[in-house]
């Protein structure tokens, strides 16, 4: 698939089958996230993939069998931008592999509890990191939705014409 075809084929999916994605596909998706642009080239983010359906039962994950948590350094100004670049790369790679995906926010709130902090410690997430969001992955339960037509007037090009 061409890149623009992948971009247009990507949809936020919120209904999944129980079928787990392969470890090989998960590693490709994580690699795509790892190669996302990051402010200043500092690579201050960290991905933790939960590849176990029993651990992803939180209802905010729409029964997806795999959840990737995107952690970033608290004190970094561009942590949100870095996280979303990583998440978008993962979504595009998943789409190319035929895997459904969706970005879920509320990462900071999810890990704000004592239980959440204990999970982070157990997973080896360093002190001073917070979860900026999640990418849920799996196989769509149902039909792939069609893209909505894009609203006109959302793109402007300034200064591209010939000067007279």
Q: Which ranges hold each PLM region?
A:
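Acidic, surface-exposed loops and disordered segments
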Residues: 1-164
């Amino acid at each position: 698939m061409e890149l623009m075809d992948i971009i247009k084929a990507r949809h936020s999916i919120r209904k999944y089958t129980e079928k787990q994605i392969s470890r090989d596909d998960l590693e490709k998706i994580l690699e795509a996230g790892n190669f996302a642009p990051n402010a200043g080239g500092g690579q201050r983010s960290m991905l933790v993939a939960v590849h176990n359906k029993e651990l992803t039962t939180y209802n905010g994950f729409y029964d997806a069998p795999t959840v990737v948590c995107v952690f970033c350094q608290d004190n970094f100004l561009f942590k949100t931008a870095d996280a979303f670049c990583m998440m978008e790369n993962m979504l595009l790679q998943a789409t190319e592999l035929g895997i459904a995906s969706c970005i879920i926010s509320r990462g900071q709130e999810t890990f704000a509890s004592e239980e959440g902090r204990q999970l982070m410690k157990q997973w080896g997430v360093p002190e001073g990191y917070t979860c900026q969001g999640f990418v849920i992955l799996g196989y769509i339960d149902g039909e792939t939705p069609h893209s909505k037509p894009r609203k006109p007037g959302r793109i402007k090009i300034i200064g591209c014409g010939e000067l007279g």
